[in-house]
C-alpha cells in the first residue's frame, strides 16, 4: 500500500536511539529521556497559507529528523513497517550529514 501525506504532513519511520545510563544499562526510546529520531519516507506538497499560496516543506524524503516522543499518529504496518504521520511543526530538527 502506498500512502501520500496531505499539506504539511510527513510520513516518518522511527529509528531507535540507544544510550547508556551511568551504570552501563542500555536505554532505548522514552526510557532514555531524549528526543526520538526518524527517517522521512514521504512529504506533503506544503502548508496552505492564508492567501491561498503554498509554502514548501523544509524536510525532504530521506532526511533524518529529531522529534519529541509522543508526536505523530501511529499507522500500523504500511508495507510491513510501522510509521508515524506528523505535521512538519512537530519536527524539532533535521540531522545534517
UniProtKB/Swiss-Prot annotation:
Keywords per UniProt: Chaperone, Cytoplasm
Pfam family, one: Cpn10
Signal peptide location: none
GO cellular component terms given for this protein: cytoplasm
Family: Belongs to the GroES chaperonin family.
Protein role: Together with the chaperonin GroEL, plays an essential role in assisting protein folding. The GroEL-GroES system forms a nano-cage that allows encapsulation of the non-native substrate proteins and provides a physical environment optimized to promote and accelerate protein folding. GroES binds to the apical surface of the GroEL ring, thereby capping the opening of the GroEL channel.
Name of protein: Co-chaperonin GroES
Species: Blochmanniella floridana
Amino acid at each position: 500500500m502506498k500512502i501520500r501525506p496531505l499539506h504539511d504532513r510527513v510520513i516518518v519511520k522511527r529509528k531507535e536511539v540507544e544510550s547508556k545510563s551511568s551504570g552501563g544499562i542500555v536505554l532505548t526510546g522514552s526510557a532514555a529521556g531524549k528526543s526520538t529520531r526518524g527517517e522521512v519516507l514521504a512529504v506533503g506538497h506544503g502548508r496552505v497559507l492564508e492567501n491561498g499560496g503554498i509554502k514548501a516543506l523544509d524536510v525532504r524524503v530521506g532526511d533524518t529528523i529529531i522529534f519529541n516522543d509522543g508526536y505523530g499518529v501511529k499507522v500500523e504496518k504500511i508495507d510491513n513497517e510501522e510509521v508515524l504521520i506528523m505535521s512538519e511543526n512537530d519536527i524539532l530538527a533535521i540531522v545534517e550529514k
